[in-house]
Amino acid sequence: MSREVVVVSGVRTAIGTYGGSLKDTPPTELAALVVREALARAHTEGKDVGHVVFGHVVNTEPKDMYLSRVAAINGGCAETTPAFNVNRLCGSGLQAIVS
């Protein structure tokens, strides 16, 4: 069976400095905002998402190690939606799109 892969939306977090204005906002919260915005821009529901891929480099807490999964669920995707992180340092975002 042939399946078509479609990228319906891409969103990123703000770029800040280490210890700057976003220091008190957990990465998983920022990522969940990104998921919600991507769903809104694509005019789709979380239950319709097949996979979630996040480019993510620095883990600040143990729960950040699976940031993509936490973000997917907290952002509105179904608990059955698979997710994975990509760590390619500066190229993480681009690798997430390619993956």
Residue map of PLM features:
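Condensing-enzyme catalytic core mediating Claisen C-C bond formation in acyl metabolism
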Residues: 1-25, 37
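N-terminal structural subdomain of ketosynthase/condensing enzymes
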Residues: 42, 50-57
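Short, well-ordered amphipathic alpha-helical segments that serve as non-catalytic structural scaffolds
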Residues: 28-43, 67-71, 96
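Generic secondary-structure signature for well-ordered alpha-helical cores
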Residues: 13-16, 39-44, 73-77
